[in-house]
Amino acid sequence: MGALSVVQIVIVPLMFVFPPIIRKFSKQKLIMAGVIITCVGLFINFIAGSNMTLLMIGALLQNAGAVPISMLASLLIVDCAEYNEWKGMRRMEGTLGSVNGFASKVGGSLGTAFAGIMIGLAGYDASAAVMPDSALLMIRLLYSLIPLALYVVVFIAMGFYKVEKDMPQILKDNEEKRAAYLAEHPETENK
């Protein structure tokens, strides 16, 4: 196991500490904080060069910042389902979850293809004894600044996420609608 892999193991305890933190802060703020921490880690990865200590610090921050993002993304889908119901539409949790899974797979595939194309265009040659500087720079960019730019897009998008502040009222209204429906249709209560 490499030194950078050990950094990922260090992140595991964060997953156990994280649930109480969710109760104190909004999902939006936690995801945005995670994005900032991840971006700092990615920037450190770019400037680290071959400095293993800096690479480990960058990886630690990158992985720590990813914890709120990965743990809260599914909860955003639930919020969207509640919002849909509140607006009189279908909840569509299954559809929203499927679209999320599909987009993740397509995004991962396109990202891998993009990385391969970019490294090829930069002059990467697996059989070369010495890698050209252009290929090394592209590898560093693909490992740091390009993901950082995408995280900036996530940060901006999360700035527009306004559903959460209305969620207590949305949940209350939805519960009242369900209770009223069950009062009118008691035969559907356990179905």
Residue ranges, per PLM feature:
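Membrane-embedded alpha-helical bundles of multi-pass transporters/translocases
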Residues: 1-191
